[in-house]
């Protein structure tokens, strides 16, 4: 049990405690199981202290330092921890019910045992936090810093991460159906194998993010910055990518059937064997794109720009390419049977062994 003389020091207030603590051996400080409820301890330094089973209910711990503290079965019911530092604290079976955790620092902290849903985190810092397999479904985490956090295998379904910073975060195999990430930052985030169907990732910054093998069916990525992102093998059926920036992105063998890519920029993108059948690509930019064996059957490609694109063995069966730009494009062995080629723009276009049977509006 804690030494009552030590307890008296803390009950004399944060300023007195901090001064006393500076001249005391930390090994002598034991506050386990102490009742410190309803106290005013703003700015108190409790770092590296064993606070197991301490009762902080209704206590003011604003700007308190609890970094590297041991918080096993500690109670913070209705406590005010706004701006507190809990970085690298050992947190296990802690009760934060109705606590104020706005702007709290939880960097590099293992939070796997913590129930974060329903907690007011404000603009908390969870960068580098360990959140593997946690359940955050339905929670609101807008504008929170999760940069470098490990959320692999986590349940984020229906959660709101609008404006959050998830750059360099690990979200591999996470359950993210209907997640809201509008305007979030996902630069270099790893989302390999994540389920993101019906997710809203519009206007998000996803430069160099890894979406390989993800499920993005009916997801919304309008106006997202996806430059250099990897979508290899991703399922993106019916996805919305209007005005999205996908320059240098890799979409090899991605399934974009019925997706809407109108006015998107896929310049220099890699689309080997990608499926875009029945997709809508009005005024989409495919300049310099690598599109060998791509499936664009029945796609609506009006005014799409394929200048200098590599379209060898591409399949355009029944596609509408009216007013499309094909200047310098390589259509060697491409299949354009029954395609609409009305008013296409061609110059230095390569048609070697292309199949134009039934095509209308053009004859090379």
Where are these regions (language model features)?
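Terminal targeting and flexible regions in eukaryotic proteins, enriched
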Residues: 1-2
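Tandem repeat scaffolds
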Residues: 5-8, 16, 20-364
